[in-house]
């Protein structure tokens, strides 16, 4: 039943069928022509489906059953931290005092919500080792851009208009160079060494008086901790640059190490990842930015302050970069993150990291005999394999990912980081049991054996999903991006 073909909602449509009846009009009827200019009025009626309420419910329920999420199965998407989202978060976020307020209310009427946001900021300050935090950015890349704009404002305020370059590792998230470009910087790539870490000699080569910042994820996207981080910070700071922390992998160091103690000047966090706000289609993000003291004047306004009379937003920020989002962040996600932090406590957050790292290393060691391991050393919260061995037998990493669909698993991240050939990037998170990990590992081993014994099974996968293998060339060259009503059948 789950895998049967599903008609489009337009194909379910029946002329004259309605799903909802409006009450009888009890006010004066107004014609569109009397309100809008003709340029804004449709010439032809929109081709909207005409369906009953039951049709709608069955249609979208059937589609939802095809979705894969953390609540329905293992989701080892590397660098995404697809951990289970505790349902107590949802209960707290639905409290009337949080769910039914409006951002334009008088501050005196939402002091409880403001207290929660202020306390969340204080928790994040402690977790990261920063001097203050703003909750305004909406998600990770938005936080990156905000942090880079703060760095830009800092340099310009100090007359360093020639600092136009941001350095990123060759293993960096794609959003790092993208955010730097949008913020008006030129990106310079620093190479990784044979151990998967930033090459210090290459870093010394590219750092100069034009360097605005070095962006790093620590541990990096190979799942390896940048053990030379203090020396890297010294190199950048001695050149007058700032050190930026991409918090995508913070799950690997919670209550174990703090970016602020490593020498980072700016950090963005992903509350929708590390701190269990639903993501991956489940809800909006939240990308708070933390800074050291010398960058505080440039934080986006307003900033949330605690006074003797309660909490208030301070708009008197002459050096601020301005607003980066209407109102003050995605409040509902912040409530969920606050609930998670308070539920876990410092010891719980430490355990999060310990189990995340344990799970990743366990999986890596079990899979290492069957796939190439580019960097054979202890990893942190995630690790990368390579499908080079399988590629020599005619099977690509993409084929392996599609074969996993047959077993009900969401595939890992593939072909990223870019500096690993046929990359397979796996992040199990701390919330998965050994039994779940073993089930996935067993299927990965089965696929590796199929590649050697019956490669066609993998090359032609998936076999059990509703949608089989797509014609990727045709999809790229002649994409169908909108519904087109089929022509009438000629009799």
Swiss-Prot record:
Disulfide bonds: none annotated. It comes from the Bacteria. The modification N6-(pyridoxal phosphate)lysine is found at residue 273. CDD domains: GDC-P. GO terms for molecular function: glycine binding; glycine dehydrogenase (decarboxylating) activity; pyridoxal phosphate binding. It catalyses: N(6)-[(R)-lipoyl]-L-lysyl-[glycine-cleavage complex H protein] + glycine + H(+) = N(6)-[(R)-S(8)-aminomethyldihydrolipoyl]-L-lysyl-[glycine-cleavage complex H protein] + CO2. Keywords: Oxidoreductase, Pyridoxal phosphate. Belongs to the GcvP family. C-terminal subunit subfamily. The glycine cleavage system catalyzes the degradation of glycine. The P protein binds the alpha-amino group of glycine through its pyridoxal phosphate cofactor; CO(2) is released and the remaining methylamine moiety is then transferred to the lipoamide cofactor of the H protein. The glycine cleavage system is composed of four proteins: P, T, L and H. In this organism, the P 'protein' is a heterodimer of two subunits. This is Probable glycine dehydrogenase (decarboxylating) subunit 2. The gene is gcvPB.
């Amino acid at each position: 039943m789950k895998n049967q073909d599903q008609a489009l909602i337009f194909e379910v449509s029946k002329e004259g069928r309605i799903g909802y009846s409006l009450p009888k009009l009890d006010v004066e009827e107004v014609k569109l022509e009397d309100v809008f200019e003709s340029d804004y009025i449709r010439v032809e009626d929109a081709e909207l489906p005409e369906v009953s309420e039951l049709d709608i419910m069955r249609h979208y329920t059937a589609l939802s059953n095809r979705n894969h999420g953390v609540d329905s199965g293992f989701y080892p998407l590397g660098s995404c931290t697809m951990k289970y989202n505790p349902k107590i978060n949802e209960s707290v976020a639905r409290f009337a005092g949080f769910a039914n307020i409006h951002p334009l209310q008088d501050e005196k009427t939402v002091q409880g919500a403001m207290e929660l946001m202020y306390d969340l900021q204080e928790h994040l300050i402690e977790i990261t080792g920063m001097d203050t935090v703003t909750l305004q950015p909406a998600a990770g890349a938005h936080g990156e851009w905000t942090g880079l704009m703060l760095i830009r404002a800092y340099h310009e305020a100090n007359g360093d208009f020639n600092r136009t370059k941001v350095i990123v590792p060759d293993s960096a998230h794609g959003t790092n160079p993208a955010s730097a470009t949008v913020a008006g910087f030129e990106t310079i790539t620093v190479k990784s060494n044979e151990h998967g870490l930033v090459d210090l000699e290459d870093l010394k080569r590219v750092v100069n008086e034009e360097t605005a910042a070095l962006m790093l994820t620590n541990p990096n996207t190979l799942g390896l901790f940048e053990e030379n981080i203090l020396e890297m910070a010294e190199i950048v700071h001695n050149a007058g640059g700032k050190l930026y922390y991409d918090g995508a992998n913070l799950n690997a160091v919670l209550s174990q190490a703090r970016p602020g103690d490593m020498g980072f000047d700016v950090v963005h966090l992903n509350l929708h990842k590390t701190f269990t706000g639903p993501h991956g289609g489940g809800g909006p993000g939240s990308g708070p930015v933390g800074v050291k003291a010398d960058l505080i004047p440039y934080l986006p306004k307003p900033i949330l302050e605690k006074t003797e009379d309660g909490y208030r937003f301070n708009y008197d920020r002459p050096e601020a970069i301005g607003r980066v989002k209407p109102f003050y962040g995605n409040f509902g996600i912040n409530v969920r993150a606050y609930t998670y932090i308070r539920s876990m406590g410092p010891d719980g957050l430490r355990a999060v990291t310990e189990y995340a790292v344990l799970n990743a290393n366990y999986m890596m060691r079990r899979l290492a005999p069957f796939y190439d391991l580019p960097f054979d050393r202890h990893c942190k919260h995630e690790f990368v394999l390579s499908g080079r061995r399988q590629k020599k037998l005619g099977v690509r990493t993409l084929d392996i990912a599609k074969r996993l669909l047959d077993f009900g698993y969401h595939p890992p991240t593939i072909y990223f980081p870019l500096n690993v050939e046929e990359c397979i990037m796996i992040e199990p998170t701390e919330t998965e049991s050994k039994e779940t990990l073993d089930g996935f590992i067993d299927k990965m081993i089965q696929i590796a054996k199929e590649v050697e014994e019956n490669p066609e099974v993998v090359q032609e996968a998936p076999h059990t999903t509703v949608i089989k293998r797509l014609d990727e060339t045709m999809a790229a060259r002649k994409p169908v991006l909108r519904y087109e009503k089929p022509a009438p059948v000629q009799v």
